[in-house]
């Protein structure tokens, strides 16, 4: 897990996040199975005691409770596109790996894990460097981007690349073997090179903080020496590289290298720090104990974001994370999660500072005092970065693994006496820590109880592994379906593939959302075939009627299932509203369902003018204000539509769609001059729009906006979200 997770990715609906989560959860559960197997084969169970383990348990409970009490359990527990690093299953995987490593690693395991950690960071950085310079290693289009890497964003990789530098600096000074020094130097140069090219300010801040921390650690825990003079000299040497890291970070904070030709690095996108804190405060005000639920930050962002964003390029964007991982965690996990995380940080920090210079520790290699100081400083680097930037999944894994490895180095660095055990349980003193050991005995109720617990753990791990495998299969099927061109000829195959994905993993809302859209397109295919016939034969056959009925039922069921799995997602409600809108001619009451879903979406994102305008259009159509057919206009609904359009313009005075429909209502109400002023504003911003020009001419000539006879009462179809600021096209 330490080595493969940062490097692994696959073609999926989330190339990096989902693939890493699937691998991580599978490896974590396999490690549990291996640990149980080792315990049974050894004939005894040993449990290393440490207070930090209680905070790990507290963090696990926080992840479970925050997911359970979330508005959308499966989204919080499994994650969703772009949101996997802090999902319930990811958090439990980190904590399982922490526990298994802490409880079972010996000296060899620890040494291998340290080299795997360093190697994974080095390979990730090297791959990222090759990509930046256009040397694409993988011959596939999705990966032939200069900013693509195996970790996440270029900023996430920059943090990941620099995170081992404090350890490398400390270990480099203590190791004597020139070959190891050469390897460490190559790693450091490669990782620094990537960070320098990206020039991410937060990476330099974190490096400076960790460098200062390393200086402080060395000051508080000087290396033992034969004499005070030698100790002073060793202390001075130990400060050289940490201070170099600090100076290096400060220099590159102010100095940026010239950009590489053809390389465009996008600026970090996300809410400001102040906005993030404001959203956190409002969320905790309503959901203080467990927060909004893991990986639900975009939902509370949509609900609480400031109206001023409507004047920016991000007016329709709901970010997956706040300005920092720490704020996101507090927002989504609540006070319980904050207490759990702070307890872990505090207890491990105290333990680490107390045990760095354990007097009876083996002082060589990775078990040396400088190596432990470097591990702690690298962990502080990650901790510092969490307060300034969202943490990518591989870096979050390192945040939990490094403390486990640090504690293992204390346990394994002890020289313990070999003893013959005459009792079935024993406490071994180990540098202030303790190991509890129980030997299995036939006929013992204690042994029976432990075996029962082990079987429960084993069964849970096997079930979890099976579930992860099913999710992997579902995602592979779904990706293959998404790669097929969505034409009428391929529609049945796509529907069958997505249905197979759902059969394998029925807990992914996005599968149902896509399925409902494809089913609706299939309905249009059937209707299109009917329309191709001569006019006298344009009536659905019994088979076609049955097919349309079946597709309608499946579409509605898919919409409802998506909403049930992800009820707080404004995008799901908008999709549902649009789907019901398309079913108006086929399903009685579909128009009311569309209105209900847009009202729900408006409650979840109250400052979005697009949603309000869409809702206003539905009320306007239902009011029959423009007199289609024999039904009398409903003035109450028309007034409601008008109020909604006015509110949309309050939210964004430049929102053209809302102004267009409001002006039509004003014209219908006899407020011709006000309507003319609004249409002139639209013409000023859309001078090439023929419909607007004609309406202005009509009003100036004293005739209704839509002319004589009026154009069809149904308002022009609103554009998609991406084009929502434009004016509706002229009806044909």
Model-identified regions with their sequence ranges:
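Transmembrane signal-anchor hairpin modules in multi-pass inner-membrane enzymes, especially those
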Residues: 1-83, 96, 100-119, 170-187, ...
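Terminal, low-structured helical/coil segments at or just beyond the last alpha-helical repeat
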Residues: 668, 673-732
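Conserved structural position within tetratricopeptide repeats
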Residues: 503, 563-564, 599-603, 646-650, ...
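Alpha-helical transmembrane segments of multi-pass inner-membrane proteins
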Residues: 1-8, 25-36, 57-67, 88-103, ...
């Amino acid at each position: 897990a330490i080595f493969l997770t940062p490097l692994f990715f696959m073609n999926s609906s989330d190339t990096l996040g989902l693939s890493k989560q699937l691998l991580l959860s599978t490896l974590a559960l396999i490690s549990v199975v291996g640990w149980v197997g080792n315990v049974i084969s050894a004939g005894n169970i040993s449990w290393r005691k440490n207070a930090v383990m209680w905070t790990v348990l507290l963090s696990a409970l926080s992840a479970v409770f925050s997911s359970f009490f979330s508005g959308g359990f499966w989204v919080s527990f499994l994650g969703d596109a772009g949101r996997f690093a802090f999902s319930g299953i990811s958090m439990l995987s980190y904590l399982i790996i922490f526990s298994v490593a802490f409880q079972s690693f010996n000296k060899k395991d620890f040494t291998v894990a340290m080299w795997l950690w360093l190697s994974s960071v080095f390979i990730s950085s090297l791959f990222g460097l090759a990509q930046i310079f256009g040397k694409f290693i993988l011959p596939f289009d999705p990966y032939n981007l200069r900013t693509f890497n195996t970790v996440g964003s270029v900023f996430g990789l920059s943090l990941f690349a620099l995170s081992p530098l404090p350890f490398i600096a400390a270990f480099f000074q203590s190791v004597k073997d020139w070959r190891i020094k050469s390897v460490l130097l190559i790693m450091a140069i490669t990782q620094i090179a990537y960070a320098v090219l990206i020039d991410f300010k937060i990476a330099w801040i974190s490096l400076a903080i960790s460098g200062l921390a390393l200086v402080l650690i060395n000051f508080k825990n000087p290396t033992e020496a034969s004499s005070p003079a030698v100790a002073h000299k060793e202390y001075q040497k130990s400060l050289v590289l940490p201070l170099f890291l600090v100076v290096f970070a400060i220099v590159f904070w102010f100095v940026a290298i010239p950009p590489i030709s053809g390389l465009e690095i996008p600026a970090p996108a996300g809410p400001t720090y102040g906005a993030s804190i404001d959203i956190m405060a409002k969320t905790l005000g309503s959901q203080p104990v467990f927060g909004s639920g893991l990986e639900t930050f975009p939902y509370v962002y949509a609900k609480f974001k400031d109206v001023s964003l409507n004047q920016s390029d991000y007016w329709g964007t709901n970010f997956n994370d706040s300005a920092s991982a720490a704020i996101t965690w507090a927002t989504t996990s609540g006070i319980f999660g904050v207490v759990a995380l702070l307890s872990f940080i505090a207890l491990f920090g105290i333990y680490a500072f107390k045990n760095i210079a354990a007097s009876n520790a083996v002082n060589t290699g990775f078990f040396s005092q400088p190596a432990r100081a470097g591990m702690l400083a690298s962990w502080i680097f990650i901790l510092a970065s969490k307060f300034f930037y969202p943490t990518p999944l591989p870096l979050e894994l390192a945040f939990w693994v490094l403390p486990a490895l640090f504690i293992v180095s204390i346990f394994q660095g002890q020289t313990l006496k070999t003893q013959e055990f005459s009792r079935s349980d024993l406490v071994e003193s180990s540098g202030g820590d303790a190991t509890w050991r129980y030997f299995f005995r036939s006929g013992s109720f204690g042994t029976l109880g432990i075996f029962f617990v082990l079987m429960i753990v084993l069964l849970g791990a096997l079930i979890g592994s099976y579930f992860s495998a099913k999710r992997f299969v579902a995602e592979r099927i779904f990706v293959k379906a998404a790669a097929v061109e969505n034409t009428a000829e391929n529609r049945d195959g796509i529907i069958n593939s997505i249905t197979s994905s759902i059969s394998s993993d029925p807990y992914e809302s996005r599968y149902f959302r896509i399925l409902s859209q494809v089913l609706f397109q299939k309905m249009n295919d059937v209707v299109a075939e009917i329309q191709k016939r001569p006019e006298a034969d344009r009536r659905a056959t019994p088979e076609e009627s049955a097919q349309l009925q079946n597709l309608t039922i499946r579409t509605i069921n898919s919409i409802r299932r998506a909403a049930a799995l992800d009820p707080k997602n404004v995008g799901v409600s908008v999709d549902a509203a649009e789907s019901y809108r398309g079913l108006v001619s086929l399903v009685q009451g579909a128009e009311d369902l569309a209105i209900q879903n847009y009202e729900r979406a408006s409650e979840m994102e109250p400052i979005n003018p697009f949603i309000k305008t869409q809702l206003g259009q539905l009320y306007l159509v239902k009011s029959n204000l423009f007199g289609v057919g024999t039904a009398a206009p409903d003035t109450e609904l028309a007034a409601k539509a008008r109020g909604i359009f006015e509110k949309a313009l309050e939210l964004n005075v430049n929102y053209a769609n809302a102004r267009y429909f409001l002006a039509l209502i004003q014209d219908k109400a006899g407020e011709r001059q006000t309507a003319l002023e609004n249409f002139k504003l639209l013409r000023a911003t859309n001078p090439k729009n023929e419909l607007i020009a004609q309406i202005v001419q009509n009003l100036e000539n004293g005739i209704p906006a839509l002319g004589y006879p009026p154009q069809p009462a149904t308002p022009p179809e609103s554009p998609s979200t991406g084009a929502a600021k434009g004016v509706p096209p002229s009806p044909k």
